A protein has these predicted regions:
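Intracellular helix-loop hinge segments at the cytoplasmic ends of transmembrane helices
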Residues: 7, 97-103, 217, 321-330
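Helix-loop junctions on the cytosolic side of multi-pass membrane transporters
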Residues: 151-173, 382
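Positively charged, low-complexity/disordered segments
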Residues: 378-393
Length: 393
């Protein structure tokens, strides 16, 4: 959703800075409300709140679709709508992350459950970008936002139908929102496993994986080829290949047994994903405009990009699933919403980090920006090596 909003802005302005700004506005809005969302998840009925947030997302996306369809879109309007979507998502994500554990009766299946939950999300990463890239090429961006709006509406209806047994472990004494938020933060700060996993997750998404938000700029070189403008198709292919890699990683993770040291797997996959994204950015520097013009579909640039983004998707998916599994297994029930809400800021870092990435890309290039950002993350990894938490025990 943020990628296609970014593409709309990039098509209007041609600015990598504004492309990164749109994504970061969404991410910052999400981060601001994540803390509130975590407290709400621990205080109130999650299912009802999820229905409300799903309907709010559907209405907001419908407005964006109508604005785009009637050619009223401006950078300011898109940024405003993305900020609203970010605020809604900030409440929505902690609810989603904390509610699904209520559906698991046998906690020994939590690794497979987290992998399956992630698999559904990653599955949409395959269908949505692949179809979206080609749909945009032939029908434009409005149809994408209409479809997204319909998806959230269907989700709200499904939630109304689903029955589930909510956790009965609610805080008996309600404190202020600030005190309850600080309680979650203090817990993370004092627990080494939670502290290290969450910091690693933030750094990885903020410094390494935010390159995804610049895909519209990275594929800009395919606008002028002998086949015409195929940038949207290439964008769809790259995002879909990354999604296929992520699904593959989730399938691999679902086979992992609880007795295996999840801590070592988490850290190892984190390092590998950063290295692969570095080489993905490097592959986009190996460009020959003349060769891309004549043979875009078999160019060395596209071939290497596909390979690196596929394996980056695998390693990053394993990292995400293993890290979430460790947290879900260890978090106290009365703090689950707040702690997991703070962890979901991880996914906001993916978009928030795009602002700095976009600024670098504006003055240099998207490829150089991706390479330098992952190089910085590689240095941060040295600080992570002191932890090899078991997690799976």
């Amino acid at each position: 959703m943020t990628i296609y909003s970014g593409k709309l802005v990039f098509d209007i302005s041609g600015s990598e800075f504004l492309l990164g700004l749109v994504a970061s506005i969404f991410g910052i809005g999400t981060i601001i409300l994540n803390f509130v969302g975590g407290v709400i998840a621990d205080r109130f009925e999650k299912k009802i709140l999820l229905i409300i947030t799903s309907l709010a997302m559907a209405i907001t996306l419908l407005i964006l679709a109508l604005v785009d369809a009637f050619d009223y879109e401006t950078v300011a309007i898109i940024i405003t709508i993305c900020s609203i979507l970010g605020f809604i998502t900030g409440i929505d994500w902690p609810l989603r992350v904390s509610i699904f554990i209520d559906f698991i009766d046998d906690k020994s299946h939590i690794v497979s459950a987290v992998a399956l939950n992630s698999l559904l999300w990653q599955g949409m990463r395959i269908l949505a970008p692949g179809l979206g890239g080609f749909i945009i090429a032939y029908y434009g961006t409005p149809i994408i936002f209409f479809m997204s709006s319909a998806g959230f509406l269907i989700m709200a209806i499904a939630l109304m139908i689903i029955r589930y047994k909510p956790s009965t472990s609610k805080p008996k004494i309600k404190k202020s929102f600030l005190n309850e938020t600080m309680e979650g933060i203090y817990f993370i700060a004092e627990d080494k496993v939670f502290r290290v996993i969450i910091i690693i997750s933030y750094l990885t998404m903020g410094f390494a994986m935010s390159y995804l938000q610049l895909i519209p700029s990275l594929t800009d070189m395919y606008k002028n080829t002998s086949y015409g403008n195929i940038s949207s198709q290439v964008m769809g292919i790259l995002l879909s290949v990354g999604g296929i890699g992520a699904v593959t990683g989730n399938i691999i993770t679902s086979r992992i047994k609880n007795k295996i040291n999840l801590g070592k797997i988490t850290l190892g996959m984190n390092v590998i994903s950063v290295i692969l994204v570095f080489f993905f950015g490097l592959s986009n520097l190996l460009t020959s405009n003349e060769y891309i013009y004549d043979n875009p579909w078999i160019s060395l640039n596209l071939s290497l990009s596909i390979i690196f983004i596929f394996f980056a998707g695998i390693s990053n998916a394993i990292f995400i699933v293993c890290s979430i599994t460790i947290l879900q297994m260890k978090v106290p029930e009365n703090l689950r919403g707040r702690v997991m809400g703070i962890h979901t800021i991880t996914f906001s870092m993916l978009t928030a980090g795009a602002l700095v990435l976009g600024i670098v890309a504006e003055f240099l290039s998207s490829s150089i920006s991706t390479v330098s950002y992952t190089h910085l993350r590689a240095h941060e990894t040295r600080e992570d090596r002191g932890w090899r938490g078991g997690g799976g025990k």
